[in-house]
Amino acid sequence: MPLIGDKFPEMEVQTTHGPMELPDEFEGKWFILFSHPADFTPVCTTEFVAFQEVYPELRELDCELVGLSVDQVFSHIKWIEWIAENLDTEIEFPVIADTGRVADTLGLIHPARPTNTVRAVFVVDPEGIIRAILYYPQELGRNIPEIVRMIRAFRVIDAEGVAAPANWPDNQLIGDHVIVPPASDIETARKRKDEYECYDWWLCTQSRG
């Protein structure tokens, strides 16, 4: 099972948009792969609507989205049609129809429910490296804005070589500022308070950019 920091496994998948090769399909872009337990289920339906709502925002962040479950393509298609007809939402992102091979590779099959994928999220960067993995129980839907926040934060982290605080960009202590990496030697530590806004030499912040 791949972990954070690992290369996303190479795989050929069948989706509602046709065959794809991951992670090459999204080379140079961020992508989010999320698994859902099954089509035509209540919580998963609310999640698909919520993911579609933020899909344009994700694409503006140069991030793609792909769903996955152990269901056949025709099931995905009928469910997507149902969502469009009954919930007035056109699902625009691809959904992987998995026979179980992809789910096994990514560690998405729960032993107690071998026919259902767990509710998981993989965040993959433009180099194909897994940057975050989230798991949710079957009865709890995902917080979609948090997933978007992660993409925004990772882009800033990578571009500026900083860290993002809790609840960024609305942190209780430093607002939308970011955290400067701690000093790694005594001389740098001594200079820190003159260079940045600091609570102490090991907790210094700066404004964006």
Swiss-Prot record:
Location in the cell reads: Cytoplasm
Which residues are recorded as binding substrate? R119
Xref: Pfam families: 1-cysPrx_C, AhpC-TSA
Gene3D superfamilies found in the cross-reference section: Antioxidant, Horf6, Chain A, domain2, Glutaredoxin
Which GO terms of type biological process are on file? cell redox homeostasis; cellular response to stress; hydrogen peroxide catabolic process; response to oxidative stress
CDD domains documented for this protein: PRX_1cys
By what name is this protein known? Peroxiredoxin
